[in-house]
């Protein structure tokens, strides 16, 4: 039955996710938005976030229009249309999610007057909207475009190549959103901390800090819109890569191997919607426990639903239905492992963060040394978990089994993005409560919500990196199989005795480091400009510190918008240009080496940066909670320095490596006909 109705089931589930998002958005917007001061602050955050995203998308649209024409001329117009569709849907998911996030923040602050349960409901529903839109629009784009191409009577191979264009479009938006949003948010954060906390001695989110609105805007454009675009891209890319690999390696199953990942994605949406309903917290209850309960319910329901689907669609494949079901379970288990490992390295209740906090008591240098040590050590367990998952999935289902494990892992993206988007909402809610001078009992509710939000943001970055590594591996398998299919008389082995493969390997290994350096330097320049601007305002408007003059908040927002847009263009085009040059000049074997090199160093660098940055951040928060002398102590000052280094590590360079790895692989896949 599913072979006839599976595509419609996937489309129906995608529409259901979008309907859930719309209904939830209407519910969130209907909640009370507080007093006039709260609404004024929220309006400033909304205006800044909207202005930044509009400028960002305008810039991307120019680059996108050029690439659309080039893809159409050199490959096919079906691929070019897919490229445009992927870019538009990815941008839409981030834009709508961010617009809801900047409305949910003030409503969460107001709901905190009535207890933690109500505030949690508003914050999580606000995040769940972004999560469901990511998977809903992602699946609708892939399944919908595939259905249209099938309806036109095009051959399966041509349909799937057009879908690779969709993956490329979503990847382009993702790297721009991740990098641009990261430069904005961390330029604001570092600038606000250096002058506000260190020089002026005022607390975080103090309304006297001229960069405070820019800091709150940055939370939304980086952690909400940026993560939405990142996981939209990973989700779409993984499903498309699995469909393509199914058509190449399991041709004997007809269209079943192509349809299977779409149906898995569809039923996982239903599981995520049900799981979201279980996220409730009572006074005195565990906030993190409530969020994890939603994730566990979603995972268990998805695992139960996968069995009949696998039996129906894949019983006749060479591996057997039970083996492929085991691959899907491996993907779900890997999700849980990555979440747990990342929380261990970034949670304040565990040894790594406490070690960095303890090192802060002996100075700034020892804090940095301890943080770097944790960042390097934190790569071991996630990489071992990914390796074990690859080994297990290949044992049961070959390369297609690895692809199914990746698809199952990404099928949880709805719930995982909800956890991430919850973070900036609670962060902003605490900031609004502080700036609007709400009673201390409100901060007593927003602070623990925000503390959990910091952990969920770290956890989702770990998930995004782990899933990106699997997705990139599947794309590499697609590249090698496509290359062989296009040139059946050639044998393509990526032999380390071949000098071109070694050259490609080394250039590939270099790219994540070069890209990361560009991102870090961009944040440094942006933060430096913010520091100068905040110092200028304190100097020229002495009434700010006394509370008699209002800071010029819009100056920092405008400055960061211009800086982030200008700084993101060159690094974002690096993964598009380099594989084209290597592929056309050195050939397909060198290009294969390039892909492997990028996957390996990119995976380690991304984990190291995001986890290490999270440990620095939470070490500062651990001290602020009263340990090692608390706020204002020498240990606290050293921890602020560590957090200042960790901020661009975990929120700009590290996360932007995810889309970098996948874009290089997608560009290589598109280049196959030209090699």
From Swiss-Prot:
One CC-aspect GO term: plasma membrane
Site (Determinant of potassium independence): 457
Keywords: Calcium, Cell inner membrane, Cell membrane, Hydrogen ion transport, Ion transport, Magnesium, Membrane, Metal-binding, Translocase, Transmembrane, Transmembrane helix, Transport
Molecular function GO terms recorded: diphosphate hydrolysis-driven proton transmembrane transporter activity; inorganic diphosphate phosphatase activity; magnesium ion binding
Transmembrane segments: 5-25, 65-85, 129-149, 164-184, 231-251, 258-278, 287-307, 321-341, 384-404, 405-425, 458-478, 500-520, 568-588, 590-610, 655-675
Cell location: Cell inner membrane
EC number: 7.1.3.1
Record bears the keyword Ligase: no
Membrane association type: Multi-pass membrane protein
Annotated site, Important for ion transport, chain positions: 178, 223, 230, 651, 662
Chain residues that bind substrate: 186, 650
Enzyme class at the top of the EC tree: translocase
Subunit structure: Homodimer.
UniProt-recorded name of the protein: K(+)-insensitive pyrophosphate-energized proton pump
Organism expressing this protein natively: Xanthomonas axonopodis pv. citri (strain 306)
Name of encoding gene: hppA
């Amino acid at each position: 039955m599913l072979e006839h109705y599976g595509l419609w089931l996937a489309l129906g589930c995608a529409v259901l996710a979008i309907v859930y998002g719309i209904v939830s958005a209407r519910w969130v917007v209907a909640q009370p938005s507080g007093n006039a001061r709260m609404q004024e602050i929220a309006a400033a955050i909304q205006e800044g976030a909207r202005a930044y995203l509009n400028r960002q998308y305008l810039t991307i649209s120019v680059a996108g229009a050029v690439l659309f024409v080039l893809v159409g001329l050199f490959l096919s117009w079906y691929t070019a249309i897919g490229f445009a569709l992927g870019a538009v849907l990815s941008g839409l998911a981030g834009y709508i999610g961010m617009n809801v996030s900047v409305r949910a923040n003030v409503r969460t602050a107001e709901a905190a007057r009535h207890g933690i349960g109500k505030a949690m409901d508003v914050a999580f529903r606000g995040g769940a909207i972004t999560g469901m839109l990511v998977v809903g629009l992602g699946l609708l784009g892939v399944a919908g475009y595939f259905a249209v191409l099938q309806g036109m009577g095009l051959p399966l191979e041509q349909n799937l190549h057009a879908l690779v264009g969709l993956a490329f479009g979503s990847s382009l938006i993702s790297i721009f959103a991740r990098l641009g949003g990261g430069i904005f948010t961390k330029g604001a954060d570092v600038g606000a901390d250096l002058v506000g906390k260190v020089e002026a001695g005022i607390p975080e989110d103090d309304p006297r800090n001229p960069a405070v609105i820019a800091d709150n805007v940055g939370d939304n454009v980086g952690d909400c819109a940026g993560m939405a675009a990142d996981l939209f891209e990973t989700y779409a890319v993984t499903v498309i890569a699995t469909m393509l690999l199914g058509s190449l390696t399991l041709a004997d199953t007809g269209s079943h191997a192509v349809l299977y990942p779409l149906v898995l994605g569809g039923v996982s949406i239903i599981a995520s919607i049900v799981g979201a309903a279980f996220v409730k917290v009572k006074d005195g209850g565990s906030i993190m426990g409530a969020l994890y309960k939603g994730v566990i319910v979603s995972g268990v329901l998805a695992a139960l639903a996968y069995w009949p689907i696998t039996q129906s669609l894949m019983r006749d494949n060479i591996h057997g239905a039970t083996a492929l079901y085991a691959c899907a379970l491996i993907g779900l288990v890997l999700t849980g492992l990555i979440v747990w490992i990342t929380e261990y390295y970034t949670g304040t209740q565990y040894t790594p963060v406490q070690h960095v906090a303890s090192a802060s008591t002996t100075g700034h240098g020892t804090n940095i040394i301890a943080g770097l040590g944790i960042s390097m050590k934190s790569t071991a367990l996630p990489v071992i978990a990914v390796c074990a998952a690859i080994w297990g999935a290949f044992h049961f289902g070959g390369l297609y089994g690895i692809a199914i494990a990746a698809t199952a892992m990404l099928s949880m993206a709805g719930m995982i993005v909800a956890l991430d988007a919850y973070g900036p909402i609670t962060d902003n809610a605490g900031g609004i409560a502080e700036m609007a001078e709400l009673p201390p009992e409100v901060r007593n509710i927003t602070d623990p919500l925000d503390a959990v939000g910091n952990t969920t943001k770290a956890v989702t970055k770990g998930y995004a990196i782990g899933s990106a590594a699997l997705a990139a591996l599947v794309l590499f398998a697609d590249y090698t199989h496509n290359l062989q299919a296009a040139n059946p008389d050639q044998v393509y082995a990526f032999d380390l005795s071949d000098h071109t493969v070694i050259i490609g390997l080394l250039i590939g290994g270099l790219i994540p480091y070069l890209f990361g350096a560009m991102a870090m330097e961009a944040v440094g320049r942006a933060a430096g400009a913010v520091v100068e601007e905040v110092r200028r305002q304190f100097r020229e408007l002495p009434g700010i510190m006394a509370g008699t003059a209002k800071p010029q908040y819009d100056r920092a927002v405008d400055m960061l918008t211009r800086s982030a847009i200008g700084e993101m263009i060159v690094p974002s085009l690096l993964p598009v240009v380099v594989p084209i040059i290597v592929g056309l000049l050195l050939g397909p074997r060198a290009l294969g080496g390039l892909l492997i090199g990028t996957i390996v160093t990119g995976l380690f660098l991304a984990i190291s940066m995001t986890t290490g940055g999270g440990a620095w951040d939470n070490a500062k928060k651990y001290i602020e909670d009263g340990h090692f002398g608390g706020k204002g102590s020498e240990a606290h000052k050293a921890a602020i320095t560590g957090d200042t280094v960790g901020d661009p590590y975990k929120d700009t360079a590290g996360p932007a490596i995810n889309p970098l790895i996948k874009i290089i692989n997608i560009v290589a896949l598109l280049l196959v006909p030209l090699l």
